Amino acid sequence: MFTGSLVALVTPMHIDGSIDWQALEALINWHIASQTQAIVVAGTTGEAATLTLDEHKAIMRFCVDIANDRIPIIAGAGANATARAIELTLAAYHCGCAASLQVTPYYNRPPQRGLYAHFAKIAAAAPLPMILYNVPTRTACDIALETVTALAKITHIIGIKEATPHARLAQIRQLFPKNQSFKIYGGEDALCAQAACEGLIDGVISVTANVAPEAMQNMMHCALNGDLKQAQAINQRLAALHESLFCETNPIAVKWALQRMGKIAAGIRLPLMPLDERWHESLTAALVAAGITIQTH
């Protein structure tokens, strides 16, 4: 299945907030050339919360068409309404996505039995591989280890993305030893090199890969193949970038960085805002430290 560096892709937008399809196509081709292992579209970093249902489905179709079997497209298809998540997952299946990423239902804070029923019903609706997504800092909802264990027995549920501390990754790995079919993906760029070196994750679903795709893939390849020294060296070069990309709520900073690189326009949808000027200098310095070419104003 999917290992290494998977990018949590931004949704490029024009200044008026409309989707920039030309820029999206260019980003997909750039990630293919950079050997990114899969692209997650219309997820948190892709501003799924402010996409219309039609836009969400159109992004899935467009990315699958542009990828043309050159790279797997994973659809962000999660929702806090089970019926909507099923609708998005069916759309992802029918347009040819390789898998779906399913965030825990946010805001309504279901009990563990509700989480199990939610994901089980989605898995039953479409024969599409599913990756669970646990990000309690955003959702106010945490999947218990017992619930993960139960869900992993369902045929189409193939892994989990954990945007959680190192200790939780270690607990998940104890449940699912390496080389099993159930995969573990890190969701915190700053932790992924160490976690991969320790064998705790099989890949990362990365924000940093938006701006440094080749470096992230090289780092993960080294970490997963025992070249720990080189993995740590690459991670050290990216350390300031990992931090700076979260100086404000994701994807504010990463979209600004991509704009400075000349990859996308400055569009972002309310209630998110363009990056506050007080962060411009530090993020620019982090990009330069990572060896990334930026455009001068």
From Swiss-Prot:
It is an enzyme of class 4 (lyase). Its main location: cytoplasm. GO terms for molecular function: 4-hydroxy-tetrahydrodipicolinate synthase activity. GO terms for biological process: diaminopimelate biosynthetic process; lysine biosynthetic process via diaminopimelate. It catalyses: L-aspartate 4-semialdehyde + pyruvate = (2S,4S)-4-hydroxy-2,3,4,5-tetrahydrodipicolinate + H2O + H(+). GO terms for cellular component: cytosol. Its EC number is 4.3.3.7. Pathway: Amino-acid biosynthesis; L-lysine biosynthesis via DAP pathway; (S)-tetrahydrodipicolinate from L-aspartate: step 3/4. The record marks T44, Y107 as: Part of a proton relay during catalysis. The keyword Amino-acid biosynthesis applies. CDD domains: DHDPS. It is found in: Cytoplasm. Belongs to the DapA family. HAMAP family: DapA. Catalyzes the condensation of (S)-aspartate-beta-semialdehyde [(S)-ASA] and pyruvate to 4-hydroxy-tetrahydrodipicolinate (HTPA). PANTHER family: 4-HYDROXY-2-OXOGLUTARATE ALDOLASE, MITOCHONDRIAL, DIHYDRODIPICOLINATE SYNTHASE. This is 4-hydroxy-tetrahydrodipicolinate synthase. It comes from Dichelobacter nodosus (strain VCS1703A). The lineage of its organism: Bacteria, Pseudomonadati, Pseudomonadota, Gammaproteobacteria, Cardiobacteriales. The gene is dapA.
